[in-house]
Amino acid sequence: MLAAAPLAANAADGTITFNGKVTDKTCTISTPGGKDFAVNLPTVSKNTLATAGAVAGRTPFAINLTKCSAGNVATYFEPGSTVDFNTGRLLNQASANAATNVQLQLLGSNNQVLPIKAAGAGLAQTNSQWVTVGTDGSADLNYYAEYYATAAATPGDVTSSVKYTIIYN
């Protein structure tokens, strides 16, 4: 006696088309410390992060570029396992003595929150700024990082990371 195997339906619900572009434009990342670097936020009191939505410790950082081709550049912060996809903020990855109810958020040089989410039509996240490469082939991509309370924070360590790619227009 043979059992009949279920047949797969041949009809698809839809098609997803992926589009992209590879360019010959390039820059050299010349940030002190190289392409991988740390941003050290100040130690803040839990009282400054006592309510959901409170922010503290805004700290500037820059990605410095040299030897760029003419045009415009921006930073694409890669969504990944360190990102809260609901908020676009960075999750606290501290494993021991971790502060709770604290995430990190990025802001552009215009002080607008920069959620780390998938790219939109402009190929940079909302509020990310395109910077025109200078005549000397350099560009500075300026940002801020700050603590963000999701509820009353508890004391402890906060650490996270995000991968980034320089994008060209």
Curated annotation (Swiss-Prot):
GO terms for biological process: cell adhesion involved in single-species biofilm formation. It comes from the Bacteria. Residues 1-11 form the signal peptide. It is found in: Fimbrium. InterPro entries: Adhesion_dom_fimbrial_sf, Adhesion_dom_sf, Bact_Fimbrial_Adh_Pro, FimA-like. The smf-1 gene is present in clinically derived strains, including strains isolated from hospital environment, but not in strains of environmental origin. Involved in adherence to eukaryotic epithelial cells and abiotic surfaces. Mediates agglutination of animal red blood cells. This is Major fimbrial subunit SMF-1.
